[in-house]
Amino acid sequence: MGFIDGKWAPMIVLIVSNMIAGMVNALVKKVLDGGINHMVIATYRLGISTLFLLPVAYFWERKTRPKLTLSISCQLFVSALFGASLMQYFYLLGLSYTSATLGSAFWAIMPSLTFVMALIFGFEKLSLKTKIGYGVVLGTLISLVGGLLLTMYQGIPLTNSPEQAANSNNHTGHENWIKGCFFLLTGVVLFSSWMLIQAKINVKYPCPYSSTVILSVFGTLQCALLSLIKTRHLEDWILRDELTIITVVIAGVVAQGMCTVGMSWCIKQQGPVVSSSFSPVVLMSATVFDFLILHREIYLGSVIGSVVVVIGLYIFLWSRSKQIVECKIMKLPTNTVEEEKEEEGRTNVNNGQLLVIPMTP
Protein backbone atom coordinates (compact mmCIF):
# COMPACT_ATOMS: atom_id res chain seq x y z
CA MET A 1 0.00 0.00 0.00
CA GLY A 2 2.86 2.35 0.86
CA PHE A 3 4.44 1.87 -2.54
CA ILE A 4 1.15 2.30 -4.38
CA ASP A 5 0.24 5.56 -2.64
CA GLY A 6 3.63 6.97 -3.56
CA LYS A 7 5.18 7.12 -0.10
CA TRP A 8 8.10 4.80 -0.83
CA ALA A 9 8.17 4.82 -4.63
CA PRO A 10 10.38 7.94 -5.00
CA MET A 11 12.83 6.60 -2.41
CA ILE A 12 13.15 3.28 -4.22
CA VAL A 13 13.58 5.02 -7.58
CA LEU A 14 16.28 7.29 -6.13
CA ILE A 15 18.19 4.38 -4.61
CA VAL A 16 17.98 2.27 -7.76
CA SER A 17 18.88 5.19 -10.06
CA ASN A 18 21.94 6.11 -8.03
CA MET A 19 23.02 2.47 -7.76
CA ILE A 20 22.80 2.19 -11.55
CA ALA A 21 24.86 5.38 -11.94
CA GLY A 22 27.59 3.91 -9.73
CA MET A 23 27.51 0.61 -11.61
CA VAL A 24 27.76 2.39 -14.96
CA ASN A 25 30.74 4.38 -13.70
CA ALA A 26 32.52 1.12 -12.89
CA LEU A 27 31.59 -0.48 -16.23
CA VAL A 28 32.71 2.59 -18.18
CA LYS A 29 36.00 2.56 -16.28
CA LYS A 30 36.46 -1.11 -17.23
CA VAL A 31 35.87 -0.28 -20.90
CA LEU A 32 38.20 2.73 -20.76
CA ASP A 33 40.96 0.52 -19.36
CA GLY A 34 40.60 -1.51 -22.55
CA GLY A 35 41.83 1.47 -24.57
CA ILE A 36 38.61 2.65 -26.24
CA ASN A 37 38.27 6.34 -27.14
CA HIS A 38 36.36 7.91 -24.24
CA MET A 39 34.47 10.27 -26.55
CA VAL A 40 33.23 7.34 -28.62
CA ILE A 41 31.52 6.08 -25.47
CA ALA A 42 30.07 9.53 -24.78
CA THR A 43 28.81 9.87 -28.36
CA TYR A 44 27.07 6.50 -28.42
CA ARG A 45 25.66 7.05 -24.94
CA LEU A 46 24.11 10.41 -25.82
CA GLY A 47 22.87 9.12 -29.17
CA ILE A 48 21.15 6.10 -27.61
CA SER A 49 19.58 8.21 -24.86
CA THR A 50 18.28 10.62 -27.52
CA LEU A 51 16.42 7.80 -29.27
CA PHE A 52 15.00 6.64 -25.93
CA LEU A 53 13.84 10.06 -24.73
CA LEU A 54 12.52 11.33 -28.09
CA PRO A 55 9.10 9.61 -27.87
CA VAL A 56 8.84 10.55 -24.18
CA ALA A 57 9.38 14.22 -25.02
CA TYR A 58 7.04 14.11 -28.00
CA PHE A 59 4.03 12.57 -26.25
CA TRP A 60 4.40 14.13 -22.80
CA GLU A 61 5.07 17.69 -23.91
CA ARG A 62 3.42 18.04 -27.30
CA LYS A 63 0.61 20.21 -25.85
CA THR A 64 2.80 22.38 -23.63
CA ARG A 65 5.95 22.75 -25.73
CA PRO A 66 6.59 26.38 -26.81
CA LYS A 67 8.05 27.34 -30.16
CA LEU A 68 11.75 26.58 -30.50
CA THR A 69 13.36 29.80 -31.69
CA LEU A 70 16.83 30.30 -33.15
CA SER A 71 17.89 32.13 -29.99
CA ILE A 72 16.86 29.26 -27.72
CA SER A 73 18.51 26.74 -30.07
CA CYS A 74 21.80 28.65 -29.87
CA GLN A 75 21.56 28.81 -26.09
CA LEU A 76 20.88 25.08 -25.91
CA PHE A 77 23.89 24.46 -28.15
CA VAL A 78 26.12 26.35 -25.71
CA SER A 79 24.43 24.57 -22.81
CA ALA A 80 25.20 21.20 -24.40
CA LEU A 81 28.82 22.25 -24.82
CA PHE A 82 29.15 22.79 -21.08
CA GLY A 83 26.81 20.12 -19.71
CA ALA A 84 27.32 17.26 -22.13
CA SER A 85 30.30 17.27 -24.50
CA LEU A 86 33.10 19.18 -22.72
CA MET A 87 31.98 17.87 -19.34
CA GLN A 88 32.11 14.30 -20.62
CA TYR A 89 35.43 14.89 -22.36
CA PHE A 90 37.18 15.88 -19.13
CA TYR A 91 35.19 13.67 -16.75
CA LEU A 92 35.74 10.46 -18.71
CA LEU A 93 39.37 11.42 -19.31
CA GLY A 94 39.79 11.80 -15.56
CA LEU A 95 38.02 8.50 -15.00
CA SER A 96 40.50 6.76 -17.29
CA TYR A 97 43.37 7.96 -15.07
CA THR A 98 41.74 7.23 -11.69
CA SER A 99 38.86 5.04 -10.54
CA ALA A 100 35.07 4.87 -10.54
CA THR A 101 35.10 5.49 -6.79
CA LEU A 102 37.07 8.71 -7.14
CA GLY A 103 34.92 9.87 -10.05
CA SER A 104 31.74 9.41 -8.01
CA ALA A 105 33.28 11.17 -5.00
CA PHE A 106 34.05 14.23 -7.12
CA TRP A 107 30.47 14.19 -8.40
CA ALA A 108 29.24 14.59 -4.81
CA ILE A 109 31.06 17.95 -4.64
CA MET A 110 28.88 19.35 -7.42
CA PRO A 111 26.03 20.82 -5.27
CA SER A 112 28.46 22.81 -3.12
CA LEU A 113 30.50 23.91 -6.12
CA THR A 114 27.37 25.04 -7.94
CA PHE A 115 26.37 27.09 -4.91
CA VAL A 116 29.76 28.85 -4.86
CA MET A 117 29.50 29.67 -8.57
CA ALA A 118 25.92 30.88 -8.10
CA LEU A 119 27.17 33.27 -5.42
CA ILE A 120 29.93 34.57 -7.68
CA PHE A 121 27.61 35.22 -10.64
CA GLY A 122 24.77 36.69 -8.59
CA PHE A 123 22.28 33.82 -8.85
CA GLU A 124 22.41 33.27 -5.12
CA LYS A 125 22.38 35.45 -2.03
CA LEU A 126 23.74 34.45 1.37
CA SER A 127 23.42 36.02 4.80
CA LEU A 128 26.02 35.18 7.43
CA LYS A 129 23.86 36.70 10.15
CA THR A 130 22.00 33.41 10.71
CA LYS A 131 23.02 29.91 11.75
CA ILE A 132 21.58 28.61 8.49
CA GLY A 133 23.94 30.81 6.51
CA TYR A 134 26.89 29.55 8.51
CA GLY A 135 25.71 25.98 7.94
CA VAL A 136 25.65 26.49 4.17
CA VAL A 137 29.17 27.93 4.22
CA LEU A 138 30.44 25.19 6.55
CA GLY A 139 29.00 22.40 4.40
CA THR A 140 30.44 23.96 1.26
CA LEU A 141 33.90 24.34 2.78
CA ILE A 142 33.91 20.78 4.15
CA SER A 143 32.92 19.37 0.74
CA LEU A 144 35.64 21.36 -1.01
CA VAL A 145 38.22 20.25 1.58
CA GLY A 146 37.15 16.68 0.90
CA GLY A 147 37.73 17.26 -2.80
CA LEU A 148 41.18 18.63 -2.02
CA LEU A 149 41.97 15.54 0.06
CA LEU A 150 40.86 13.29 -2.79
CA THR A 151 43.20 15.13 -5.15
CA MET A 152 46.30 15.57 -3.02
CA TYR A 153 46.32 12.52 -0.74
CA GLN A 154 46.18 9.00 -2.12
CA GLY A 155 47.38 7.18 0.99
CA ILE A 156 48.12 3.53 1.54
CA PRO A 157 46.07 0.76 -0.13
CA LEU A 158 43.46 -0.79 2.16
CA THR A 159 42.89 -3.83 -0.06
CA ASN A 160 45.19 -6.27 -1.81
CA SER A 161 44.99 -6.39 -5.59
CA PRO A 162 47.65 -8.36 -7.50
CA GLU A 163 46.87 -6.37 -10.66
CA GLN A 164 47.54 -3.05 -8.93
CA ALA A 165 50.27 -4.04 -6.47
CA ALA A 166 53.06 -3.58 -8.99
CA ASN A 167 52.01 0.01 -9.62
CA SER A 168 51.00 1.03 -6.08
CA ASN A 169 54.27 2.93 -5.46
CA ASN A 170 54.89 3.90 -9.05
CA HIS A 171 55.74 7.60 -9.49
CA THR A 172 53.99 7.63 -12.87
CA GLY A 173 50.88 6.18 -11.24
CA HIS A 174 50.83 9.02 -8.71
CA GLU A 175 51.22 11.60 -11.48
CA ASN A 176 48.31 10.02 -13.34
CA TRP A 177 46.26 10.18 -10.13
CA ILE A 178 46.86 13.94 -9.79
CA LYS A 179 46.23 14.48 -13.50
CA GLY A 180 43.03 12.43 -13.35
CA CYS A 181 41.75 14.38 -10.33
CA PHE A 182 42.34 17.64 -12.20
CA PHE A 183 40.33 16.37 -15.19
CA LEU A 184 37.52 15.12 -12.92
CA LEU A 185 37.35 18.48 -11.16
CA THR A 186 37.28 20.28 -14.51
CA GLY A 187 34.35 18.12 -15.59
CA VAL A 188 32.43 18.87 -12.39
CA VAL A 189 33.12 22.62 -12.75
CA LEU A 190 31.79 22.52 -16.30
CA PHE A 191 28.65 20.71 -15.16
CA SER A 192 28.12 23.24 -12.36
CA SER A 193 28.45 26.01 -14.95
CA TRP A 194 25.87 24.22 -17.07
CA MET A 195 23.39 24.26 -14.20
CA LEU A 196 23.54 28.05 -14.07
CA ILE A 197 23.24 28.36 -17.85
CA GLN A 198 20.34 25.92 -18.04
CA ALA A 199 18.48 27.66 -15.21
CA LYS A 200 18.16 30.75 -17.41
CA ILE A 201 17.13 28.71 -20.45
CA ASN A 202 14.43 26.87 -18.49
CA VAL A 203 12.60 30.14 -17.92
CA LYS A 204 12.21 30.61 -21.69
CA TYR A 205 11.83 26.94 -22.61
CA PRO A 206 10.34 25.06 -19.61
CA CYS A 207 10.12 21.61 -21.20
CA PRO A 208 12.43 19.17 -19.39
CA TYR A 209 12.33 16.22 -21.78
CA SER A 210 12.34 18.27 -24.97
CA SER A 211 15.31 20.26 -23.67
CA THR A 212 17.10 17.03 -22.78
CA VAL A 213 16.53 15.60 -26.27
CA ILE A 214 17.81 18.77 -27.96
CA LEU A 215 20.81 18.88 -25.63
CA SER A 216 21.50 15.22 -26.37
CA VAL A 217 21.40 15.81 -30.13
CA PHE A 218 23.80 18.74 -29.88
CA GLY A 219 25.94 16.83 -27.39
CA THR A 220 26.15 13.81 -29.69
CA LEU A 221 27.45 15.92 -32.57
CA GLN A 222 29.88 17.79 -30.33
CA CYS A 223 31.22 14.58 -28.77
CA ALA A 224 31.74 13.08 -32.23
CA LEU A 225 33.83 16.11 -33.22
CA LEU A 226 35.79 16.05 -29.95
CA SER A 227 36.62 12.39 -30.52
CA LEU A 228 38.73 13.49 -33.50
CA ILE A 229 41.20 15.04 -31.04
CA LYS A 230 42.32 11.58 -29.97
CA THR A 231 41.95 9.55 -33.14
CA ARG A 232 40.47 9.74 -36.63
CA HIS A 233 40.40 6.03 -37.42
CA LEU A 234 36.99 4.77 -38.52
CA GLU A 235 37.54 1.36 -36.90
CA ASP A 236 37.48 3.01 -33.46
CA TRP A 237 33.74 3.48 -33.92
CA ILE A 238 33.13 -0.22 -34.47
CA LEU A 239 32.36 -1.85 -31.12
CA ARG A 240 33.41 -5.49 -31.23
CA ASP A 241 33.84 -6.33 -27.56
CA GLU A 242 30.67 -7.68 -25.93
CA LEU A 243 31.29 -5.86 -22.63
CA THR A 244 31.75 -2.54 -24.45
CA ILE A 245 28.46 -2.95 -26.33
CA ILE A 246 26.57 -3.91 -23.16
CA THR A 247 28.11 -0.97 -21.27
CA VAL A 248 27.19 1.56 -23.96
CA VAL A 249 23.60 0.28 -24.18
CA ILE A 250 23.12 0.26 -20.40
CA ALA A 251 24.70 3.71 -20.11
CA GLY A 252 22.46 5.12 -22.86
CA VAL A 253 19.11 3.43 -22.25
CA VAL A 254 19.13 2.81 -18.50
CA ALA A 255 21.52 5.29 -16.86
CA GLN A 256 20.97 8.19 -19.24
CA GLY A 257 17.45 7.49 -20.50
CA MET A 258 15.38 5.78 -17.80
CA CYS A 259 17.24 7.41 -14.90
CA THR A 260 16.65 10.85 -16.43
CA VAL A 261 12.90 10.23 -16.40
CA GLY A 262 13.05 8.69 -12.92
CA MET A 263 15.15 11.44 -11.38
CA SER A 264 12.98 14.17 -12.92
CA TRP A 265 9.88 12.51 -11.44
CA CYS A 266 11.53 12.19 -8.02
CA ILE A 267 12.52 15.86 -7.99
CA LYS A 268 8.88 16.78 -8.63
CA GLN A 269 7.64 14.36 -5.95
CA GLN A 270 10.19 14.91 -3.18
CA GLY A 271 12.01 18.11 -4.11
CA PRO A 272 15.63 18.67 -5.09
CA VAL A 273 17.13 18.51 -1.59
CA VAL A 274 15.75 15.04 -0.82
CA SER A 275 16.76 13.84 -4.28
CA SER A 276 20.30 15.17 -3.85
CA SER A 277 20.64 13.51 -0.44
CA PHE A 278 20.73 10.12 -2.16
CA SER A 279 23.78 10.99 -4.28
CA PRO A 280 26.22 9.22 -1.87
CA VAL A 281 24.56 5.98 -3.02
CA VAL A 282 26.42 6.53 -6.31
CA LEU A 283 29.69 6.63 -4.39
CA MET A 284 28.93 3.48 -2.41
CA SER A 285 27.72 1.62 -5.49
CA ALA A 286 30.77 2.67 -7.52
CA THR A 287 33.10 1.56 -4.71
CA VAL A 288 31.53 -1.90 -4.54
CA PHE A 289 31.54 -2.41 -8.31
CA ASP A 290 35.01 -0.87 -8.60
CA PHE A 291 36.36 -3.44 -6.17
CA LEU A 292 34.34 -6.46 -7.32
CA ILE A 293 34.39 -5.92 -11.10
CA LEU A 294 37.65 -4.07 -11.66
CA HIS A 295 39.53 -5.57 -8.68
CA ARG A 296 41.06 -2.18 -8.00
CA GLU A 297 42.68 -1.22 -4.73
CA ILE A 298 40.82 1.07 -2.35
CA TYR A 299 43.13 3.74 -0.94
CA LEU A 300 42.99 5.41 2.45
CA GLY A 301 42.92 8.86 0.84
CA SER A 302 39.83 7.93 -1.19
CA VAL A 303 38.00 6.70 1.90
CA ILE A 304 38.87 9.73 4.05
CA GLY A 305 38.18 12.21 1.25
CA SER A 306 34.86 10.55 0.35
CA VAL A 307 33.67 10.56 3.98
CA VAL A 308 34.56 14.26 4.31
CA VAL A 309 32.73 15.07 1.05
CA VAL A 310 29.59 13.21 2.16
CA ILE A 311 29.59 14.91 5.58
CA GLY A 312 29.94 18.30 3.92
CA LEU A 313 27.21 17.40 1.42
CA TYR A 314 24.66 16.57 4.12
CA ILE A 315 25.48 19.68 6.17
CA PHE A 316 25.07 21.75 3.00
CA LEU A 317 21.80 20.07 1.96
CA TRP A 318 20.28 20.37 5.44
CA SER A 319 21.17 24.05 5.63
CA ARG A 320 19.90 24.69 2.09
CA SER A 321 16.57 23.01 2.86
CA LYS A 322 16.10 25.28 5.88
CA GLN A 323 17.18 28.30 3.82
CA ILE A 324 14.71 27.50 1.03
CA VAL A 325 11.82 27.23 3.51
CA GLU A 326 12.90 30.50 5.12
CA CYS A 327 13.06 32.25 1.74
CA LYS A 328 9.57 31.04 0.80
CA ILE A 329 8.16 32.43 4.04
CA MET A 330 9.88 35.81 3.62
CA LYS A 331 9.40 36.07 -0.15
CA LEU A 332 7.63 39.23 -1.34
CA PRO A 333 5.84 39.57 -4.71
CA THR A 334 7.86 41.19 -7.46
CA ASN A 335 6.69 44.34 -9.20
CA THR A 336 7.59 43.78 -12.84
CA VAL A 337 7.66 41.00 -15.40
CA GLU A 338 11.44 41.33 -15.70
CA GLU A 339 11.86 40.91 -11.95
CA GLU A 340 9.57 37.88 -11.98
CA LYS A 341 11.63 36.23 -14.71
CA GLU A 342 14.87 37.03 -12.91
CA GLU A 343 13.48 35.61 -9.68
CA GLU A 344 12.26 32.48 -11.48
CA GLY A 345 15.70 31.89 -12.94
CA ARG A 346 17.29 32.35 -9.53
CA THR A 347 14.75 29.98 -7.96
CA ASN A 348 15.65 27.29 -10.50
CA VAL A 349 19.23 27.39 -9.21
CA ASN A 350 18.40 27.78 -5.54
CA ASN A 351 15.97 24.88 -5.45
CA GLY A 352 17.87 22.70 -7.88
CA GLN A 353 14.80 22.43 -10.11
CA LEU A 354 16.77 22.54 -13.32
CA LEU A 355 14.42 20.12 -15.09
CA VAL A 356 17.15 18.74 -17.35
CA ILE A 357 19.67 15.99 -16.60
CA PRO A 358 21.79 15.66 -19.77
CA MET A 359 24.41 13.29 -18.39
CA THR A 360 24.70 11.22 -15.26
CA PRO A 361 28.16 10.47 -13.89
UniProtKB/Swiss-Prot annotation:
The record gives the membrane topology as: Multi-pass membrane protein
Asked if the record carries the keyword Transmembrane helix, the reply is: yes
Q: List the disulfide bonds.
A: none
Organism superkingdom = Eukaryota
What are the residue boundaries of the EamA domain, all occurrences included?
21-142, 194-317
Q: What SUPFAM superfamilies does the annotation carry?
A: Multidrug resistance efflux transporter EmrE (SSF103481)
Q: Name one Pfam family in it.
A: EamA
User: Where does it localize?
Assistant: Membrane
Q: Name one GO molecular function term.
A: transmembrane transporter activity
What stretches pass through the bilayer?
Answer: 8-28, 40-60, 76-96, 103-123, 132-152, 177-197, 209-229, 243-263, 273-293, 298-318
The record ties this protein, via InterPro entries, to: EamA_dom (IPR000620), WAT1-related (IPR030184)
Q: Which GO terms describe its cellular component?
A: membrane
* Keywords in alphabetical order: Membrane, Repeat, Transmembrane, Transmembrane helix
Q: Which family does it belong to?
A: Belongs to the drug/metabolite transporter (DMT) superfamily. Plant drug/metabolite exporter (P-DME) (TC 2.A.7.4) family.
Output this protein's name: WAT1-related protein At4g01450
Q: Which organism is it from?
A: Arabidopsis thaliana (Mouse-ear cress)
